[in-house]
Amino acid sequence: MKKLNFLCSELSGTGGTETVLIKVLNHLVNKYEITLTLSNVPEEKEWLDKIDTRVKINMFKGKSNISKLLFILKLFLFEKNTDYISLSPKMVLLGSKIKKFLNKKYQVISWFHYSLTDQDMFDTEHTLPYADGHLAISRTIEKQLEDLKIPREKIKLIFNPIEEYDVLPETNNSKEINLFYAGRVMLDGQKNLREMLMGIKEIDNVHLDIYGTGEELESCQNYAGKMGVSKKITWHGWTPDLWNKIKERPSALIMTSKYEGLSMVMLETVARGIPVITSKFKSYDDIVKENINGYSYSLGNIKELTKAIEKVANNALNPIDVKNSISEYYPKEYFKRLDSSLEYFLDS
């Protein structure tokens, strides 16, 4: 049985990447000997309990950077008959350099879950071309890899998996526009909640449920107070099982992000027949189909945002059409693409 080691860094335990990892590892463990390597101890560890017990979890628990480097070096130097799927650019670079220097035979495949250009975490140009192959989770990332002059045959577009769910029942007799946001609470930066709060200020009959927390929670709450929208918002805090909390169909998910990789909460929402209001970050249209499963607006354009919110209220999108709009992400199609892509890279 072939061995695969999934290399991850800086996982919090609360994000969409962890959700995808659970599904992918639990699928692949039936075909490969799987190890999950974490270069940090996640803040939240409940997600690890959802991983198949046949998956070996290898976690760095030290604190010094030198110890961490040695921990990672040992993987590439001493593991036998193992290929690597890396969610970490630094580990792609390190593994590829060791492979070349010591003439190792393993494959290093990148699998990144965020936009490659809208970030300052690593130098894409001097990192990504070293990988033997790339699993792209969105058309935007696929295009970014091509722009780095990576050969087309080294890139496979696989998207991300999402379960197929029943459509949630409609909220009874509500004339209110019920919006929700789920994710890290950030006033500015990636999640850009400032814009969301500005948007709901302009509409009277709206209520926003915010599921999540973060270092900027207090700043967001203070800004909501300053904008006079505090009474329109319920702050739920960190919610480990979002869909046990949301039992009836809200009007829409709202996202005002500056950038995303492929938003899992967006997919989870659409899969339940709930439309999406979103900023036009790169790759948003991998999921959102205008007037079919949601509405979009240009970042910074609050007038467009309020119009998108009003469209949700005035145009009753068919929840079955919403759900069916992302059929390519459902397990049967997704795992077919994943399996064939891995076979292509690992057998080459």
Placement of each model-derived feature along the sequence:
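A conserved mid-protein helix/loop that constitutes part of the nucleotide-sugar donor-binding site
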Residues: 15-23, 187-202, 215-218
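Aromatic "clamp/platform" in nucleotide-sugar-dependent glycosyltransferases that forms part
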Residues: 258
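Short His-centered aromatic/hydrophobic patch
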Residues: 85-93, 112
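Conserved acidic donor-binding segment of nucleotide-sugar-dependent glycosyltransferases
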Residues: 290-291, 295-302, 309-316
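Short hydrophobic beta-strand element within catalytic cores of glycosyltransferases
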Residues: 275-278
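N-terminal strand-loop element at the rim of the active site
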Residues: 6-66, 216
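Active-site donor-binding acidic/aromatic loop of nucleotide-activated sugar
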Residues: 216-219, 230-240, 245, 295-296
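Conserved donor-binding/catalytic core segment of Leloir-type glycosyltransferases
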Residues: 5-7, 172-190, 197-200
